[in-house]
Amino acid sequence: MERWQNIHKVVVVGLGITGLSVVKHLTKTQPQLTVKVIDTRATPPGTERLPEQVELHSGGWNTEWLAEADLVVTNPGIALATPEIQEVLAKGAPVVGDIELFAWAVDKPVIAITGSNGKSTVTDLTGVMAKAAGLTVGVGGNIGVPALDLLEQDADLYVLELSSFQLESTLSLKLKAAAFLNLSEDHMDRYEGMSDYRQAKLRIFDNAELAVVNRDDQETFPDTETPLVTFGSDEQAYGLEADGNRTWLLDHGQRVIASDELKLVGKHNLANALVVLALLKAADVDYHKSLNALKTYTGLTHRCQVVADNRGVKWVNDSKATNIASTIAALSGLESTGKLYLLVGGVGKGADFTPLKPIFATLNLQLCCFGADGDEFMPLHESATRFDTMEDVIQQISSQLKTGDMVMLSPACASFDQFDNFMARGDAFAALAEKYA
């Protein structure tokens, strides 16, 4: 392949899951190359899985290797502004990420998703619905399987979640369609400001045939002329139509499905579903064949996931909400006919929780505060009650639950006061739901 004509020595920076996938891809598809790995950690994960012929320099940089390299493949966690990477760029050698290598090798349609919130759900649901329509689909990138490992599946369609970090080192990824869901403050330790962060995200549109953007968030629109389609909360294009007490998902005026037919919870998830419809249509997938898959989709584990629905009471696990923005997103447009029993608390990481107060005021709410920083939530609603643990909360409220009520864990805090991680916290909630539902 022409791209590889003048490339003989490749240095992979950063091991771990992504680095290993790069090494495996290079040694398999370009066996003529000399591949070396640099990792600044003393004992990087995955060392024992490196092929014998691949040298590893760990515990610091190896500037000699970098100076000799014809190509450097860097890990998304390493900023391009890192001095050692800047030196490589200054001497004119290309620096790319694993997604760029994927772009060089892929020969089937690709769709990709970025955004500050919701991208994992959109990526996963797009894959689920495309599979239900009869396609072989490779789903991965920033979620689950590294992009290069997906190439082994020989899929009809690839669906990638891409972070801003991955997009920084991607130059030529051709996409059937690309979605930019929303933009909110994140990774400000890596970027100079919101504008810098947004520019990294916008790179997803550089070689896209169609941009799918959020009408309710103008920051998602490309700065250059790109064919685009929009989604949003009004009735245009991909949108929502309120009819009495039902809400319909629309595709350019045509009703597709009503929100009460879906297992997904929250208005933000209706927006996510609209994006999926737009992406599938752009990739020539007939989404009408897979509406059943949309109806039964419960969401990613620990993200607004319905874990029990018994006697008219929904139990929703949103343990992934480890900050205020995630909890606000989960509560916005929540459809519940009865009382919402909301479990909040854990390790607050010094956050100011007062932005939750106005949204709490709009809800028929029983606020259940637990964990190390549970006290921080007590002034935010008159119903606030203090508990030690999540189990204490469920034991106390289980006898009060009525048809139409919802019990939701969306803690706005980290979990490590009482759990190993947010997954363990979510699993504990799901087990309690099963016991008491």
Curated annotation (Swiss-Prot):
Keywords: ATP-binding, Cell cycle, Cell division, Cell shape, Cell wall biogenesis/degradation, Cytoplasm, Ligase, Nucleotide-binding, Peptidoglycan synthesis. The keyword 4Fe-4S does not apply. It is found in: Cytoplasm. It catalyses: UDP-N-acetyl-alpha-D-muramoyl-L-alanine + D-glutamate + ATP = UDP-N-acetyl-alpha-D-muramoyl-L-alanyl-D-glutamate + ADP + phosphate + H(+). One of its GO terms (molecular function) is UDP-N-acetylmuramoylalanine-D-glutamate ligase activity. HAMAP family: MurD (MF_00639). Cell wall formation. Catalyzes the addition of glutamate to the nucleotide precursor UDP-N-acetylmuramoyl-L-alanine (UMA). This is UDP-N-acetylmuramoylalanine--D-glutamate ligase. It comes from Vibrio campbellii (strain ATCC BAA-1116).
